[in-house]
Design a protein with these regions (language model features):
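Conserved beta-strand positions in repeat-built beta-propeller and related beta-rich domains
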Residues: 56-60, 94-106, 147-155, 196-200, ...
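Short coil/turn segments that connect the beta-strands within blades of beta-propeller domains
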Residues: 52-53, 89-90, 142-144, 191-192, ...
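A short beta-strand motif characteristic of beta-propeller blades
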Residues: 31-38, 70-76, 121-128, 169-177, ...
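Blade-loop segments of beta-propeller domains
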Residues: 70-102, 107-110
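Short loop/turn segments that connect beta-strands within beta-propeller blades
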Residues: 67-71, 116-120, 164-168, 208-211
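Structural motif
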Residues: 64, 102-113, 154-161, 202-207, ...
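Repeated scaffold domains used in trafficking and secretory/extracellular systems
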Residues: 41-46, 79-87, 130-140, 179-186, ...
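Beta-strand-rich domains and repeat architectures in extracellular enzymes and scaffolds
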Residues: 34-61, 81-84
């Protein structure tokens, strides 16, 4: 091979390698406010993206894939109760409870279901019965999965169950959050921190560090979904209803705010 051709190929290859993370960041940053096409029987439980061109919406008994404009690309019926979800290496991981939530005696039936992010085909089911009050939310950090869920009345802390890539429990973390109604609904790790959406009156956003030490407790509704998309940029979900009572889903840009937790951006 001629030296000039070899040099050109090396330059192109290097540019491609260097450009790949930049393109990924650009793609993530291109996510904007969006409404999910269609209406659904049950309310939104969580959202995530593939960090490129798709948004995933969990409507309790419907799992929906849309493009960045909210146009449905794929939709499947799923078992109740499919909760929050996260994306990792081409797969969706969904927190699923087939039993009772928030029961002091347990009686939950907690799982993580794994789907192909392109086709929504079911790949695997992992038991997570350690999530005693019902698996409702999930996030991923450094290739490990963190499952959250229900909570009985009066319990003044929340729990995070850490699993390895094979869904073997490695640790149960305690968040000194104070009581949150029905536990934690949604979870995402972004910008070096955990963000947890909770029910309540008012609804609560919890923020912790990587060791689940409290960084903030804010009166903000992220209980239907929260996902990071770029540095200093997240999407939070809303779930209005139609006049017939059918459930809708939308995502709204937000940025971190020291006093409020997050602020919607115009």
């Amino acid at each position: 091979m001629k030296p000039t051709i070899m040099i050109a190929l090396l330059v192109c290859s290097t540019m491609s390698i260097l450009d790949s993370p930049v393109r990924a960041a650009d793609n993530a940053a291109n996510f904007e406010n969006v409404k999910c096409e269609g209406d659904y029987q049950h309310h939104l439980q969580g959202v995530c993206t593939n960090e490129r061109d798709a948004v995933y919406w969990s409507f309790t008994t419907d799992l929906v894939k849309t493009d960045r404009l909210g146009r449905v690309q794929k939709k499947i019926a799923v078992a109740s109760h499919h909760g929050d979800l996260c994306f990792h290496k081409g797969k969706l991981y969904v927190a699923v409870n087939l039993g009772k939530f928030n029961d002091p005696k347990g009686n939950a039936d907690s799982w993580v279901y794994v789907y192909d992010a392109d086709t929504l085909g079911l790949i695997a089911k992992h038991e997570t019965q350690e999530v005693f009050h019902g698996a409702g939310g999930i996030g991923v950090m450094n290739g490990r999965f963190y499952v959250v869920g229900g909570l009985p009345d009066g319990v003044e802390e929340n729990y995070v169950y850490e699993y390895d890539s094979e869904f073997r429990l490695t640790r149960k973390h305690v968040i000194k959050s104070g009581w949150t109604q029905l536990g934690i609904q949604t979870a995402t790790f972004h910008d070096g921190a955990w963000w947890f959406g909770c029910y309540g009156s008012p609804k609560i956003l919890l923020k912790t560090d990587t060791n689940f030490h409290m960084l903030g407790r804010h009166e903000l509704d992220c209980s239907l979904g929260i996902v990071g998309i770029a540095k200093g940029r997240l999407l939070i979900a809303k779930g209005p209803r139609t006049s017939e009572g059918r459930c809708l889903g939308s995502l709204h840009l937000a940025r971190p705010d020291e006093k409020r937790g997050l602020m919607l951006t115009p």
